[in-house]
Swiss-Prot record:
Belongs to the AIM39 family. The keyword Ion transport does not apply. It comes from Saccharomyces cerevisiae (strain Lalvin EC1118 / Prise de mousse). It is found in: Mitochondrion membrane. Keywords: Membrane, Mitochondrion, Transit peptide, Transmembrane, Transmembrane helix. It comes from the Eukaryota. One of its GO terms (cellular component) is mitochondrial membrane. It is a single-pass membrane protein. This is Altered inheritance of mitochondria protein 39, mitochondrial. The chain crosses the membrane at residues 156-176.
Length: 395
């Protein structure tokens, strides 16, 4: 139903204006300032009353006072109020934006980044383990644990590599060559010197006393024809007691032509007698430590023989210095796979201040390489005189 409160509502324009003046709230300080900033808008000219109709049920018991209050409080806002609220909101938004922009400019941490991006970066560092809360000792312990694990892994890899290589070599030398094929096998260990002392087995094949006598005769023969010895010591050459000079020291050693290695020789355990000293592994093999040369030419010959060729089919090397007495015409010791140079060294004392020192090589006959005279002069200096030197010989 319409118009139950008709007597309490204004019916013309004049009554509407009077009612708006009565209901208009007092101006606050902020609204007054806003009106001064924007004086263009005239609220009196724009104000208009709005008639609101209410539909009340037929059987509802509503007093006129309550109906009038409903009408007053539900009146729609005027155009001026809406405009002022909009302006206030826009001014507040601008002030906030200016404040934020100034804060971003004056804050050096966020000159190129925003606080939101920095927060994400910190979160990412914390997830990766770079948290500032973690102590330096913890970081060092973690680093040491990682380093220890890597070193342990590296040692395991190298141990596996060397273990595999050693297993392959030992399996081929011992299991395949000795046990399966019943052959001799040599396992090299480390390089050795070409010069070594004569073993007891070598001394049995070389007459050292004969070499000593022959070398002394050859030295006295050469010294008797030397001019310096004739003038200062006389001929025949005698010692301070007037007797024939004697040897104070004499030694012999052998030298291989090729580089040598020290290794282990392994053979099947056949229990045969041998001049060597063997160590036995019952029912498996016997072994001993020995020296062997590395013959490059012999290795090439073996490779060519396997394909049906010989070294003479490809080339032949003839050295002009290879004459009688050199290594080419020397015979190897019985039972050895290579020939040896047998060297000797001797000393003959003439008097208290004079000493003859010589060295040479022996093969069937003595071949001297050098003879020196060491003499202490009157001023106390020790002087070496080279009396003989074989330039064509091999040292």
């Amino acid at each position: 139903m319409w118009g139950l409160c008709k007597n309490h509502f204004p019916s013309n324009k004049i009554q509407v204006q009077e009612r708006n003046k009565a209901l208009k709230p007092k101006k606050s300080g902020s609204e007054h300032k806003t009106k001064q900033l924007f004086p263009v808008f005239n609220c009196k000219k724009k104000e208009k009353g709005v008639m609101i109709r209410f539909a009340i049920l037929r059987n509802a018991n509503t007093s006129l006072l309550s109906a009038r209050s409903i009408c007053l409080f539900t009146q729609a806002p005027t155009y001026c109020h809406v405009r002022l609220n909009t302006l206030n909101k826009s001014i507040t938004t601008k002030r906030n934006s200016l404040t934020e922009s100034k804060r971003h400019v004056h804050d050096g941490k966020h000159f190129f980044t925003t606080p939101h991006q920095q927060q994400q970066t910190k979160l990412g560092e914390i997830e990766e383990g770079h948290s500032p809360n973690i102590k330096g000792e913890d970081l060092r312990s973690i680093g040491q644990a990682i380093t220890h694990q890597r070193n342990k892994r590296r040692k395991q890899i190298w141990s596996a590599i060397f273990g595999g290589i050693f297993g392959v070599i030992l399996g081929y030398s011992l299991i395949y060559r000795v046990i399966y094929l019943k052959e001799q096998s040599f396992l090299p260990l480390f390089p050795s010197s070409k010069i070594r002392k004569l073993s007891t087995r070598d001394l049995k094949k070389v007459d050292v006393n004969q070499v000593q006598k022959l070398s002394k005769l050859r030295v006295l023969e050469i010294l008797s024809g030397h001019d310096m010895i004739k003038e200062q010591y006389g001929v025949p050459l005698l010692d301070k007691d007037g007797n024939s000079p004697t040897l104070n020291e004499f030694s012999m050693w052998c030298e291989d032509q090729d580089p040598c290695v020290t290794g282990i020789v392994m053979e099947p355990d056949d229990k045969r007698d041998s001049s060597h000293t063997w160590y036995r592994i019952p029912f498996v093999c016997k072994w001993r430590i020995t020296h062997r040369p590395i013959s490059i030419r012999g290795t090439i010959d073996d490779l060519l023989n396997r394909i049906g060729l010989e070294t003479a089919d490809l080339f032949e090397i003839i050295s002009p210095e290879r004459v009688y007495g050199s290594f080419k015409y020397e015979y190897p010791l019985q039972g050895d796979s290579h020939a040896l140079h047998l060297w000797f060294h001797g000393e003959i004392e003439l008097d208290d201040d004079s000493l003859i020192v010589y060295n040479g090589k022996y093969h069937v006959d003595v071949k001297l390489q050098e003879i020196d005279l060491f003499r202490r002069e009157k001023n106390g200096q020790l002087v070496q005189y080279v009396l003989y030197k074989n330039e064509a010989g091999d040292k």
